[in-house]
């Protein structure tokens, strides 16, 4: 039996603006706001499209109907083995931190990576 109220689900286009807000809010908390940081990646504004390709998946975490975080997987760019993937753009607003959502999202991403092979 789960002891939390959040829900992990695949991202939809409806979630794109919310995830862009979350990413642009969280990254500066850690000093990650200049050139070369993911905060400036064009895909931040359309995560549902960016992670809709082969061997890609992105999930959002909802709490009481509000998206408070997300994270996903995609093939590792430049890898010689196309089966190698990486965790990408995993961010949570403070209201979701410290409750185990990160662990559950990581497990969800790892399960999807295994499914991809």
Task: Label every PLM stretch briefly.
Residues 6, 10-94, 106-108, 112, ...:
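Acetyl-CoA-dependent GNAT
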Residues 1-5:
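Basic/polar N-terminal segments that are highly enriched at the extreme N-terminus
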Residues 96, 100:
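Glycine-rich phosphate-binding loop
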């Amino acid at each position: 039996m789960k002891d939390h109220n959040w829900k992990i689900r695949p991202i939809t286009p409806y979630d794109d603006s919310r995830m862009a807000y979350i990413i642009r809010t969280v990254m500066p908390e850690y000093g990650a706001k200049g050139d070369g940081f993911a905060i400036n990646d064009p895909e931040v504004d359309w995560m549902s499209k960016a992670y809709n390709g082969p061997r890609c998946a992105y999930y959002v975490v909802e709490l009481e109907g509000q998206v408070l975080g997300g994270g996903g997987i995609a093939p590792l760019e430049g890898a010689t083995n196309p089966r190698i993937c990486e965790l990408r753009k995993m961010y949570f607003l403070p209201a979701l931190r410290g409750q185990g959502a990160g662990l559950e999202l990581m497990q969800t991403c790892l399960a999807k990576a295994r499914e991809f092979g």
